[in-house]
Amino acid sequence: MKSFGSDHSKSGRDIGKKKGTSGNSTTNSKKNTESSLGGNTKVDSTSQSTSQGSSSGDSLSREERLARFRKSSSSVIGLDSMIEDRKEEGILKTNAVHMEAPFGKPIEEVYEGVHTGPVLGTGLSGLVRLVAHKATGVKYAVKCLDLGLIDTEEELARLREEICIMCKLDHPNIVRLEEVYESHNEIYLVQELCPGGELFDRLDEQPGYRYTEAECARLVKQMLSAVRYLHSKGIIHRDLKLENFLFSSKAKDSDLKMIDFGLSKHFRKGEVHHDAVGTPYTVAPEVIKGSYDERCDLWAIGVLTFLLLTGDAPFGGCGGPEPLTKVRDNILSATYAFEPADIWESVSESARSFISSLLVVDPRKRPTATEAQKLPWLTEWAEKSRSEADNAINPKVVKALVKFKELSDIRRLLCEVLSFTLLPEQIKDLRKEFEKMDIDGSGEISLWALKEVLLTNAAAGSLGTMSEQEVEDIFNAMRVKKTETRIHWHEFIAAALSQCKIDDRNLRLAFDRLDSDHKGYITLDDIMNLLGKDGLPREDVMREMWGDSMKEVNHETQTHITFEDFALLINKAQAQDSDMGLPTWFILSLHEWLDTFLPMDNDDNNNNTKQVMPCIMCSPTSLANIFPFHC
């Protein structure tokens, strides 16, 4: 298991004395230690975010190790075969993660600061740096893994597993993997940047080094949603801790993002795992014993809830004076107390009950993530914080969803790819709307939930009339892969794209994602490769839709789409919220401009009033004269 205490000097509630982290960090360094929690349970020294192993004194040279791993593949980790496998699967959220062909375009040509950018964190096998996309200026975190420090096939398999897992994840509270590059010496994982910093550091800033119960409940709710999502996809995290949750922004009400899947693993229901991994202060007793399943993640949530409410870890292990053997004994017997009294007397009984239900030694008696979401503490606080506005769906978003189903499959696909390029500030309003529809807290939207929300709002008169069939049509249009039973986070964003302020940065990033081999244009094959064989409509249908797209950009005989063509197609796809074909955000901006510059008239009472003029948005003819490119 990873050693936490070796790097962080923090005793009791002195959480503010944490050392060795950067303010904007996405990782923490951990010393290579042979400490143990007693018995034969060895501490895994793998680092939090570059968790792929350390040098073990192998007699092979660096070059010999890399050559051994490459074998028949040109890639150490088999990146080329992973690219081919994804084409078969047909999962857009997976294929949308760009994997540069081994030794293809160097990452240094795409990003500024790969080797010189500010270090956000360090680990045993590399660094995490802040970089900027050269063409757009968008900032990302790049995890640079030194392949020369990977000694065993097991460590290599763990790295492959991390990449495969991150490619499949699409949840508002889980960090997004954007791109993967490989050089002769390193693997680069380009990830969404979370400038809000670690939950560990944010806790350090709280009065008394602890959160209020209301804020703690908000954060735990997000953690559980991410854990439930992982488990529903057959993934166990195995290293949940404060450092592995980042805030997406510096705002006080910022959402959490789960990170670091270096120890994560796929599992089958009922499967038992035996390798001892994790962090001493959050590790579950069954992990120490060497026989566990996905419910070890729920134990960690119980520990984190306790810690957020008090600043203390219930069993020690947070760099305090207690030896790891004592921490081990406390965990194995679930020995902890709701102390000191001056803190816990202000904490509700339902919060204590929530923690107690998770910190149960027998994992079979521990609730699942879904069951934990329904425990009274979370439901009570959710009800207290809910307002009427939390139930009302924005009619403009619903209108966007209705219009989305009228687009062709290719148009919808382009919107989906574009959705992965949006920054947090561009989708913060959609995040709220998504949460209203995610009524079961799964991080996805079921057909039942969509019907419940839309039909209830329609009945209340806020959406006009709407039938069950219309809701089903909306649901089916949002699903990229028709065998899926739920709508994913970015599928929702794609459908409501017209509510976002799209700019040239997004268009360029999306175009480059489609033009994965850097031709300078997009072909039908690029589209088909992105969808994969299993995700494709019939090929003749795709070719017909492609031909229609060509007509829309006035290229009936052309076989490819340039960046300018792509921008025009996206503009038309987004133009769905007004009869003139202009997106809502543009109309609102235009109204604001008119409000600023319209001349003033004086009425009989000498009060300044705006001159009454016809709105150009009500006059398609005048609009065509102003914006001829749109018609």
What are these regions (language model features)?
Residues 116-124, 128:
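Protein kinase glycine-rich loop
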Residues 127-148:
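Glycine-rich ATP phosphate-binding loop
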Residues 144-169:
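Conserved N-lobe beta3->alphaC-helix segment of eukaryotic protein kinase catalytic domains
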Residues 180:
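Activation-segment/catalytic-loop signature of the eukaryotic protein kinase fold
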Residues 185-198:
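Conserved short submotifs of the Hanks-type protein kinase catalytic core
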Residues 219-220:
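Activation segment signature within eukaryotic-like protein kinase domains
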Residues 415, 444-462, 487-499, 523-536, ...:
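Amphipathic regulatory helices of Ca2+-sensor modules
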